[in-house]
A protein has these predicted regions:
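Glycine-rich cofactor phosphate-binding loops and adjacent beta1-alpha1 units
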Residues: 133-144, 162-163, 178-179, 183-236
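Glycine- and other small-residue-rich loops at beta-strand/loop junctions that grip anionic moieties
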Residues: 54, 94, 115, 144-148, ...
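Single conserved hydrophobic/aromatic residue that forms the stacking wall/gate
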Residues: 1-8, 12, 234
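NAD(P)H dinucleotide-binding glycine-rich loop of Rossmann-like/cofactor-binding domains
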Residues: 61-146
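Glycine-rich beta-strand-centered segment in the early N-terminal region that forms part
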Residues: 5-9, 24-66, 106-108
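Mid-domain Rossmann-like dinucleotide-binding core that forms the NAD(H)/NADP(H) cofactor-binding site
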Residues: 109-193
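N-terminal glycine-rich cofactor-binding segment
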Residues: 14-40, 52-54, 73-88
Length: 236
């Protein structure tokens, strides 16, 4: 295991806020939160390097790990979580993780940007699954991203900047979130009840909200044979 020096940058996500307010059954006090971090390594192969880490620690020996599905490992542990197993999070002054969970940050990438690697990976994975499942190129799909939070915005950026999707809509009831999205991505930003969000009107829907109401709307507005990519589940 390697020690990770006191982080330079940390992200505070909605999961952390849920836990802070006692609404996350997998994160119960007393617990140090935090799983999105960039910082400097104290010792090991990457000593003194600015790095990001994968907060998911797995056994690497089960059938799921060996088939590239580490997220299904029965012995998986996530930083900043105590269910099913406790592991203190990255807000601690020092943390230890296996060396294979640490990745050197390219010199051209700012350490603040590097801290967003984990949610970016979540969003990119969702887009790649949609690419694999879709019967038409993503740049030809009429696409709806439900939710203008971190995952929704990152999905929209990847769809627009990498996949070349120009027929993109982001929906969110919070106008401030929509305004923020408009600063970074060329997309139509609307409320979830906007008249343009019609039944069977989208080739591709990304549900980054994870509520029953968003799931039902996704099912309603996707075209027959279309794709719904779910990248978030809401904890009650």
């Amino acid at each position: 295991h390697l020690e990770h020096r006191r982080q330079r940058q940390m992200c505070i996500r909605d999961r952390d806020m849920h836990a802070y307010h006692g609404k996350d059954e997998r994160r119960i006090p007393p617990l140090i939160l935090g799983h999105e971090v960039s910082g400097q390594i104290i010792n090991g192969k990457l000593k003194d390097q600015i790095s990001v880490l994968n907060p998911l620690i797995t056994c690497r020996n089960c059938e799921y790990c060996k088939s590239g599905r580490e997220h299904l490992c029965p012995d998986r542990v996530l930083l900043g979580m105590n269910r099913p197993y406790e592991r203190q999070g990255a807000f601690a002054e020092l943390i230890t993780v296996p060396d294979h969970n640490i990745f050197k940050v390219p010199e051209k990438l700012d350490v603040k940007e590097a801290a967003v690697a984990e949610p970016t990976a979540v969003s990119y994975h969702a887009v790649l699954l949609a690419v694999e499942a879709s019967k038409k190129p993503l740049n030809e799909c009429r696409t709806l991203v439900q939710g203008g939070g971190a995952i929704g915005l990152l999905c929209a950026l990847i769809l627009s900047k990498i996949q070349g999707n120009t027929n993109l809509t982001i929906s969110d009831p919070n106008q401030k979130r929509l305004n923020a999205c408009s600063k970074y991505v060329d997309a139509k930003t609307v409320s979830p009840d906007h008249k343009d969000i019609k039944e069977s009107s989208f080739d591709l829907v990304f549900d980054t909200v994870g509520l029953e109401v968003s799931r039902q709307q996704a099912i309603s507005v996707v075209k027959p044979g279309g794709i719904i990519a779910v990248s978030y589940t809401h904890l009650r």
